[in-house]
């Protein structure tokens, strides 16, 4: 989870995409 957050780079759009991908994963 923390690793995914780091990948988001604090981007709002990226955060949403990362959440969707990690939720689907």
From Swiss-Prot:
The keyword Phosphoprotein does not apply. It is an enzyme of class 7 (translocase). It catalyses: 4 Fe(II)-[cytochrome c] + O2 + 8 H(+)(in) = 4 Fe(III)-[cytochrome c] + 2 H2O + 4 H(+)(out). Keywords: Cell inner membrane, Cell membrane, Copper, Electron transport, Heme, Hydrogen ion transport, Ion transport, Iron, Membrane, Metal-binding, Respiratory chain, Translocase, Transmembrane, Transport. GO terms for molecular function: cytochrome-c oxidase activity; metal ion binding. It is found in: Cell inner membrane. One of its GO terms (cellular component) is plasma membrane. Its EC number is 7.1.1.9. One of its GO terms (biological process) is oxidative phosphorylation. Pathway: Energy metabolism; oxidative phosphorylation. Its cofactor is Cu(2+); heme. It is a multi-pass membrane protein. Its main location: membrane. Binds 1 copper B ion per subunit. Subunit I and II form the functional core of the enzyme complex. Electrons originating in cytochrome c are transferred via heme a and Cu(A) to the binuclear center formed by heme a3 and Cu(B). This cytochrome c oxidase shows proton pump activity across the membrane in addition to the electron transfer. Belongs to the heme-copper respiratory oxidase family. This is Cytochrome c oxidase subunit 1. It comes from Paracoccus versutus (Thiobacillus versutus).
